[in-house]
């Protein structure tokens, strides 16, 4: 399949999160990343904007009754930046996880503006 956008990880937060997950979860995450890269319109059950943030999205991973989230955002429309992930244990996404992702997004833009 041809890619319509590029997905990259910022720093090592996503990689660290990914390595701690079971292989089945890693495979599901890779499948969703592939969908984000290749589908022009990504289904909301894979990628959803987070209300109350400035451009933050969460990639949604479900396997059985367990749920994982990976935060990301778009840079220049076709570049998706993966930030951090967590295991979701409550209905609502924890505010501290959103705040961490927002700090990472700010850090990404600060680093980008330096170069």
Show the residue positions of the predicted features:
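Basic, Lys/Arg-enriched alpha-helical interface segments
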Residues: 1-67, 76-80, 89-115
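ATP-dependent carboxylate-activation loops
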Residues: 83
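RNase H-like polynucleotidyl transferase catalytic core
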Residues: 86
């Amino acid at each position: 399949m041809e890619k319509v956008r590029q997905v990259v990880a910022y720093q090592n937060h996503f990689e660290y999160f990914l390595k701690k997950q079971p292989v089945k979860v890693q495979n599901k995450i890779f499948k969703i990343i592939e969908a984000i890269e290749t589908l022009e319109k990504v289904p909301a059950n894979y990628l959803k904007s987070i209300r109350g943030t400035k451009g933050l999205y969460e990639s949604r991973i479900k396997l059985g009754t367990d749920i994982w989230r990976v935060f990301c955002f778009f840079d220049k429309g076709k570049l998706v930046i993966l930030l951090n992930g967590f295991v979701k244990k409550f209905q609502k996404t924890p505010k501290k996880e959103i705040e961490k992702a927002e700090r990472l997004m700010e850090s990404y833009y600060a680093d980008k503006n330096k170069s």
